[in-house]
Amino acid sequence: VKNQSHGYPIDPVPFTSVKVTDSFWGQRLNASREVTIPLAFSKCEETGRYTNFVNAAHPSDTIKVGGLAFDDTDVYKTIEGASYLLQTYPDKKLAKYIDSVLVIVAAAQEPDGYLYTSRTMNPKHPHEWAGSKRWEKVEELSHEFYNLGHMVEGAIAHYQATGKRNFLDIAIRYADCVCREIGTGEGQQIRVPGHQIAEMALAK
């Protein structure tokens, strides 16, 4: 009742306030720490997810944009999962690895905050789902808002688990870019996401 002033009577418990000690779930978390997260990061390396960010930091009209328009989110979600583990199993090596990945991600961000490698790595010939201009195909397949939603979720988890702002600041800059360019104001565009996820990020 006392929290009704927030608009909703129930507040979620921060995941950083929960420690799983049960043997069953403890085994699952340990498997995630030892197998799943390292495998997911290795797949990001092997399948060119990181290369996309490197290419976006050094765009060229000779780069062939392949894969899927939402490939960036594999990096964001893996960092999110790793962040959940860091609060239960502090790991300096893992934290350092995440920081190194975030250096690559930050380098791919455009000056105004826009971060969508499927366009930025080759603005003249972006991914076929991206459209010729920003947000042009948000309602279809570009996944620009979808990518942002996963980025925000990962950035919040990383900040809550580590207290570091390096990922959070990247996400805020992209969110600010969207707020400037999308809306009903003069010079803005009205766009509706074709795939939900940004809404989940807003809830957080």
Give residue spans per PLM region:
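Glycan-recognition and catalytic cores of secretory/periplasmic carbohydrate-active enzymes
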Residues: 1-204
